[in-house]
Design a protein with these regions (language model features):
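Acidic-glycine-rich active-site phosphate/pyrophosphate-binding loop
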Residues: 29-32, 36, 151-167
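Phosphate/pyrophosphate-binding loops at sites that engage ATP/ADP/AMP, CoA/4′-phosphopantetheine
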Residues: 120-139
Length: 189
């Protein structure tokens, strides 16, 4: 039996060998948890995970907007964080029951931004804790569906972290999306 570290497999897939020779940071925001991995060569120099991810955003939307979890999941697919509306702008959500519900655009965006700020704050704490010689130019790659499937999510997340972020994309045609990096990394090993 062989143990495969999911963050290491993910990093080995999305990062070129030359890129791994210098330290890189891979952040994977999944549904229920987030991992922050420092990648150096063919290994991880540090790894930490915490319980907060995209499903927390969905739960926040459900609770704040008074809608079901499934309806909140559908609303999250419509969110565009780069939009700043006025009081008359809404997301129109067709609920699973078939009725149309109007959710104020700015309110829904604020709910999502609040949780993304919490995730980013925790990621920054992880980076500070484990990077004794943290160099501000270490490239950061974002994987997982927790942030990447939210329109404008990566840019807002980068702003919260205070760094440029690139998507960690698997080099596989038709599967080159950050939400597939973890799964394909494990299959690749």
């Amino acid at each position: 039996m062989e143990y495969l570290s999911e963050p290491l497999c993910e990093a080995m897939l999305i990062l070129e060998k030359e890129e791994r020779e210098r330290t890189c940071i891979v952040i994977d925001v999944g549904a229920r948890s987030t991992s922050v991995a420092f990648v150096k060569g063919d290994g991880l120099s540090n790894l930490t995970s915490f319980s907060m991810g995209g499903s927390y955003i969905t739960s926040d939307l459900s609770e704040a907007c008074g809608i079901s979890y499934n309806d909140a999941r559908n609303l999250k697919k419509e969110i565009v964080l780069s939009l700043k509306g006025n009081d008359s702008d809404f997301y129109e959500l067709v609920t699973l029951g078939g009725r149309v519900t109007k959710i104020p655009l700015n309110f829904a965006n604020e709910v999502v931004c609040y949780r993304l700020e919490l995730i980013a704050k925790t990621v920054n704490e992880c980076i500070r804790l484990f990077a004794k010689e943290y160099v501000p130019y270490y490239p950061i790659y974002l994987c997982g569906a927790g942030v990447s499937k939210i329109k404008g999510g990566k840019d807002f997340f980068a702003k919260c972290i205070g760094r440029n972020i690139s998507y960690g994309l698997p080099p596989i045609p038709a599967m080159d999306k950050p939400e597939y990096a973890s799964m394909l990394g494990l299959l690749n090993e």
